Amino acid sequence: MNVLPRRARGVLAVALCSLVLSACGGSDGTDGTRGGYISGDGSYVVVDAPDRKDAPELEGEDLEGEPLSLEQFAGKVVVVNVWGSWCPPCRAEEPILSAVARELADDDVQFVGIATRDVAGARAFERAREVPYPSFADDAGTYAVQFADSLPTMATPTTWIIDADGKVAVRYLGPFTSESTLRGLIEDVQGSRS
């Protein structure tokens, strides 16, 4: 039994293909982007202090090959951002992250990136932009998935804010578009304890 007429099936197929292709936006790679990201909508989850789960024990190397772990920032609020130099929304939010990182550097707040896929491109991007915080080199995509037990990632970029007790307090999906939103979430976490 044919539920949809042939013409309706054709229209539906074209619409689905258009939707899929628009979600993979990007370029030919000449500008350093490759698409293949899923950007969030700026929605976020704030976990009440008693309900927070332990942050994963991320440990590895930064983009320069130096040892890096979340443990070295124990006692600080840590802002962890999953990004890629190939991701246009990630590139767009970098000035916001860097500005707030510089502003709060003396307030027991540490920023850390998780650079996915193209580590060489990420290293060049961080150097060119003078990003003031380290990023884990994550060619294999193994770091972000470690947040699955608390608040899993569903987009690139995704940002988590870990409280000073090492618990995941916030997950923000998509790029930050204002310093005040990021700063406000950090201040909320600073004012709460798990």
Question: Residues of each region from the PLM?
Answer:
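N-terminal targeting signals for export/organelle localization
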Residues: 1-59, 184, 191-194
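N-terminal post-signal-peptidase region of extra-cytosolic proteins
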Residues: 43-44, 68, 144-147
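A short beta-strand-turn-helix
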Residues: 48-78
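Short active-site neighborhood of thiol/selenol oxidoreductases, capturing the structured segment around
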Residues: 68-91, 97
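Active-site-proximal beta-strand/loop segments in catalytic clefts of secreted hydrolases
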Residues: 82-84, 114-117, 138-139, 175
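Structural microenvironment flanking redox-active thiols in thiol-disulfide oxidoreductases
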Residues: 91-130, 140-146
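Thiol/disulfide oxidoreductase modules built on the thioredoxin-like
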Residues: 127-132, 139-191
